[in-house]
């Protein structure tokens, strides 16, 4: 199995992992509008507000990202008895996958970060917050709830935004309890004194935070490694994962191993919350049994996804799979998409009046028979989507020695063909769910089927589509090719 295949499989294993996240919950508000003039009162732009949204921020965004990759997080935090606190509690409750343990502290100001945007450009951020440590009674409640949740957790995350939930006594105590229970601890740190996180498994400072915590220059790879090693030596961390914006990430481990991961983003729109995505993906991966380098690789890929979105965004599991495939692609890379993204593209095609076709198969060792069917399929429509069985699906259908080529390789070959407009990898034995989602106008299969035996034929016909049986090329099959290769 290739490293890529292993990572793709790892993404699936993120589902159902239990991660305990403790930290500062916030409310992220986004105000979108347009700017067409300068204020006569001062040399500042006038934002004409068009819409507003709100979502979980701070440690809450870590939890959102955990849910996005399929994890089942428990969330322990504190809010005030104010409107923002009630909104945070409501937003947490909207995610059925989250086990919420939100403690209300009377009189506390719930942190609100309000960002103003015009044409994807952030103009201003306005904060309302409290940085005071939570009271002793609240701290006792937090510890009681965490003690109950810790045994079930694969990993504990401390998401410290310096708003009081993880003030020194509680951070130290939580790490002590987690280590005693044999749990890994990931810390997204705040401030300059990292000794309060001593004994944590991994800390994830950005470049600026690393400089402030160590006082060292962090411009080059060598300087970043030296500063990270200082933290490892002084605080007993197993590893430091440094996020370095356009320079990617650097993982430095106590055993001396170093991994430099290049930035994955193609275009950066907004870095809001990217650090939360890194922490969440890293935690879910470690909870699933991944090694630190594997987990860091996935976290780096996830960060590249979210900075390409506007606002405090998340990276979904299917987006991770697509991004992993793209690492090895040269031609047709934009053609390989998850079914959710394919549905959006198909909708755009339909609005332009284009007829959408669909065919599917394993396409292991592409041969003239495959090429002929794809050409006939494209001839029956304007845009052709190819459903591709995943490696696991092919193995169930064809046996333990198949596929010969990985799903990444098969998708790459298909996407390089001019007849193919999109490739969607599916893990089920049949493409029925994909067909139901995309609702193609034309469904194409080889003439070795009859229409009543074609999976999805009744569905396509139910919405007025048609089923086309493509002519076969005699003697062409992957099985025959494999037999010839084996001398049979």
From Swiss-Prot:
The active site is at 276. Its EC number is 2.7.1.167, 2.7.7.70. InterPro entries: Bifunc_HldE, Cyt_trans-like, PfkB_dom, RfaE_dom_I, RfaE_dom_II, Ribokinase-like, Rossmann-like_a/b/a_fold. It catalyses: D-glycero-beta-D-manno-heptose 7-phosphate + ATP = D-glycero-beta-D-manno-heptose 1,7-bisphosphate + ADP + H(+); D-glycero-beta-D-manno-heptose 1-phosphate + ATP + H(+) = ADP-D-glycero-beta-D-manno-heptose + diphosphate. Residues 1-331 are annotated as: Ribokinase. GO terms for molecular function: ATP binding; heptose 7-phosphate kinase activity; heptose-1-phosphate adenylyltransferase activity; phosphotransferase activity, alcohol group as acceptor. It comes from the Bacteria. One of its GO terms (biological process) is ADP-L-glycero-beta-D-manno-heptose biosynthetic process. ATP binds at residues 206-209. Homodimer. HAMAP family: HldE (MF_01603). This is Bifunctional protein HldE. It comes from Paramagnetospirillum magneticum (strain ATCC 700264 / AMB-1) (Magnetospirillum magneticum).
